[in-house]
């Protein structure tokens, strides 16, 4: 079955694929990268849009409102979780739908303050950095636990390019340490997690290494740590991380899928630490992976 609870913790074992601890099954990721503000959901406590969201670009959904996922209400099933007298059915239904289509991972930001969506954060308000919203995080936990049952990895993007200097001006200071500590304390027990240092990340080499080292020091389950960057910046971002003991691989944004995947697989072997190389954003941005009707074999994203 799909339920991760029958498979054990998903671990990095020094190979190019993650492996479930109990069954030994290898994990080949295939999932949803959009919407990145998946947790910007209208029925979570303390969730609102601060300021004006980023402008709507070609191929994007309306940016002015929180997600409702109304078409997926019908995908909720009796016995599935809810909170506060029936809230949460739509987002739970959305996850049911993804699992029914064979997906096994969902990419989502845990903080987009001052970013594109401006509607996801773990604190009591968008301008708070030290007090965490317990009821909201309890509701996230309900969703994440359902993902375990559905066999969906939590690919948690801890920041994005617009806000990667927001906490401690980009350093590993008290704000960032508390943020990482809260995420790990609340959610690291889940069986399949990837911690992503940031979308289109602009921190320094030293900062990225410090973040990864700190996360691994705190996470008792040693979930993999990866990082996403801009196309064209792979060498600048990933080369200094080759062989680094606290980093497990790149989170690629490209339409040159085969060549870049092979390149970083090969380079990681040469550096003595095999990476899991994942393709997490496929260009062009306004289409990504096309619908089955337009590209039935999805050959465009395999080349």
Report residues per predicted region.
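Ligand-binding face of N-terminal immunoglobulin V-set domains in extracellular IgSF glycoproteins
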Residues: 1-3
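Short microdomains enriched in Cys/His and/or Lys/Arg
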Residues: 6
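Active-site mouth of glycoside hydrolases
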Residues: 9-249, 253-259
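Catalytic-core region of carbohydrate-active enzymes that cleave or remodel glycosidic bonds
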Residues: 220-222, 241-303
